């Protein structure tokens, strides 16, 4: 497949309003691709270059992209930036700039889908002091051979933000339709492999094998997620439940085979070198080959410390030993996904818990059975007294469903409801906040698109505001007056008093009295609130269901 064909598919998808029509279009393309092209196309059309579990990262920021395009077009970086500010879209701006170049130059080489992928692999492999120079050289070569339409989607792909509405759910359904398979079978394989590109290839080569796909050590899967809910509703719906403390820590996944172990964050990053104490504790705690799910909790004098202490340990590459002395982390393991060559994800929680107790023992988080709301609320009160966030209320026969935010697991916390939202823009401040960002535009995800739900300015101290400016200043993609568009990479936890319907935002909803709680450095965009889950929260709110 030529990259131009891929760009044309994306252009058609971008102009298609209906979800089913989009699925039809992608499903029609998939069978025409060869075995090498198929997984690459599937990832690309979702705006991704590598599988979620892969440690490969492009490492391309807006400035590198601006420099590459400026070089190819024969202009200055500021001209590229101005074009992006005018259009509000990196892809459209690059397309326009390349259209001017096209009138005065000849193409050197046709871009092929696989050639683009191999060049992006080369970009990701660049390391050391000269890595940025090598990445720039690769980007210049790609844009130098790109037609304007190709440039639109190449620019977005480099920033891994395609904006055409093909999220995982749509692509999963397209794979099922293309190869005439039950979508549940495709979803099962996707949960285990964590790569729809590989799933698509397997669906064509050996569809019968999809049902037998299992998770593998050292290939992290997405973590099962919880919805906000109530103790009373969970017990009313399911009878006996398992109640666990909700820790103010950071999720991790521990993989072990023999004497080799790795730890992955909830963003699926390898953080083993940052957490040698956690690795050693769990390595010594079991002789079995396992994949465990748990939470790293900071403690001082036996009492839990806030999340901010935990995150200072994650992804730290320097002075790890000195930071270990300052901040003690303990693992609280609450689930087991894999044991001695066998996946346990499809087994009920009660069985998984029994296996966990048998193979680990130490460092297992306490779990309490409850059959009535009074007993569960007593555990909830105890959790708060101990300094924890609240409780998790889990259905005992629930399977482990990677990446799914469902009601089989419910989180219960006191006070204001919170949402994890993607920061997609900001507005320059005034008065005391002049010279920095004063408010931030927040969005929910919906099948590859990010839809705004409001702005937050309240709850941000001057000190935090300075930290946020440092965090975002190099993530600015476009400017328009006082407003800027940001790379959608950072997640805010935001409190609110009410969800309202609103014509002012593309999502159709707005938050009443939004308040900044914290940056969720441990969370990826894929783990943020979806439009569907926001609508469900709105429905529960209208029905008068609270958070306790």
From Swiss-Prot:
Catalytic activity: ATP + (deoxyribonucleotide)n-3'-hydroxyl + 5'-phospho-(deoxyribonucleotide)m = (deoxyribonucleotide)n+m + AMP + diphosphate
Active site: 246
Cofactor: Mg(2+)
Domain of life: Archaea
Keywords tagged on the record: ATP-binding, Cell cycle, Cell division, DNA damage, DNA recombination, DNA repair, DNA replication, Ligase, Magnesium, Metal-binding, Nucleotide-binding
Any single biological process term in GO: cell division
A Gene Ontology molecular function term of the record: metal ion binding
Presence of the UniProt keyword Ligase in the record: yes
PROSITE patterns with a match to the protein in the record: DNA_LIGASE_A2, DNA_LIGASE_A3
Keyword check for DNA repair: yes
UniProt binding sites for ATP: 244, 251, 266, 295, 334, 405, 411
Enzyme Commission no: 6.5.1.1
Family: Belongs to the ATP-dependent DNA ligase family.
Job description of the protein: DNA ligase that seals nicks in double-stranded DNA during DNA replication, DNA recombination and DNA repair.
Protein name as catalogued: DNA ligase
Protein source organism: Methanoculleus marisnigri (strain ATCC 35101 / DSM 1498 / JR1)
């Amino acid at each position: 497949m030529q990259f131009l064909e891929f760009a044309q598919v994306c252009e058609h998808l971008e102009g298609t309003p209906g979800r089913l029509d989009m699925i039809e279009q992608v499903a029609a393309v998939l069978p025409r691709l060869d075995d090498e092209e198929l997984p690459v196309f599937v990832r690309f059309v979702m705006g991704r270059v590598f599988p979620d579990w892969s440690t490969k990262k492009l490492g391309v920021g807006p400035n590198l992209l601006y420099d590459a395009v400026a070089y190819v077009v024969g202009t200055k970086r500021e001209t590229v930036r101005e074009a992006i500010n005018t259009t509000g879209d990196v892809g459209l701006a690059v397309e326009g700039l390349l259209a001017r170049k096209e009138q005065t130059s000849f193409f050197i080489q046709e871009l092929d889908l696989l050639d683009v992928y191999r060049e992006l692999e080369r970009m990701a492999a660049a390391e050391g002091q000269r890595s940025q120079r090598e990445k720039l050289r690769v980007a210049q070569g790609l844009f130098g051979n790109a037609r304007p339409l190709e440039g639109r989607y190449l620019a977005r792909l480099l920033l891994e933000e395609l904006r055409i509405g093909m999220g995982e759910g749509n692509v999963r359904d397209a794979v099922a339709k293309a190869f005439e398979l039950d979508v549940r079978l495709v979803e099962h394989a996707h949960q285990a492999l964590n790569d729809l590109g590989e799933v698509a290839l397997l669906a064509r080569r050996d569809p019968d094998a999809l049902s037998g796909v299992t998770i593998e050590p050292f290939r992290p899967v997405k973590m099962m997620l919880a919805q906000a809910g109530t103790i009373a509703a969970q017990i009313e719906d399911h009878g006996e439940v398992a109640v666990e403390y909700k820790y103010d820590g950071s999720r991790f996944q521990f993989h072990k085979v023999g004497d080799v172990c790795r730890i992955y964050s909830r963003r699926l990053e390898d953080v083993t070198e940052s957490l040698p104490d956690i690795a050693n504790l769990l390595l010594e705690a079991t002789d079995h080959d396992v994949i465990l799910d748990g939470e790293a909790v900071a403690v001082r004098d036996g009492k839990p410390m806030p999340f901010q202490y935990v995150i200072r340990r994650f992804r730290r590459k320097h002075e790890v030993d000195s930071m270990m002395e300052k901040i003690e982390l303990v693992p609280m393991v609450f689930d087991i996904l894999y044991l001695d060559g066998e996946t346990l994800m499809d087994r009920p929680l009660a069985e998984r818990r029994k296996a966990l107790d048998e193979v680990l023992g130490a460092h297992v988080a306490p779990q309490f059975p409850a059959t009535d709301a009074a007993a569960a609320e007593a555990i909830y009160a105890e959790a708060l007294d101990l300094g924890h966030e609240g409780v998790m209320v889990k259905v005992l026969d629930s399977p482990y469903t990677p990446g799914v935010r469902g009601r089989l697991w419910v989180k219960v916390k006191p006070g204001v409801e919170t949402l994890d939202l993607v920061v997609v823009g900001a507005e320059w401040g005034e008065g005391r906040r002049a010279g920095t960002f004063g408010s931030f535009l927040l969005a929910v995800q919906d099948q590859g698109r990010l839809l705004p739900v409001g702005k937050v300015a309240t709850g941000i101290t001057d000190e935090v505001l300075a930290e946020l400016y440092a965090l975002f200043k190099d993530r600015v993609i476009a400017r328009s007056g006082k407003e800027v568009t940001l790379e959608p990479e950072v997640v805010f936890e935001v409190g609110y008093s009410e969800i309202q319907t609103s014509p002012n935002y593309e999502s159709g909803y707005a938050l009443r009295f939004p308040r900044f709680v914290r940056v969720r450095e441990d969370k990826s965009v894929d783990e943020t609130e979806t439009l569907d889950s926001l609508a469900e929260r709105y429905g529960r709110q209208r029905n008068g269901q609270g958070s306790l």
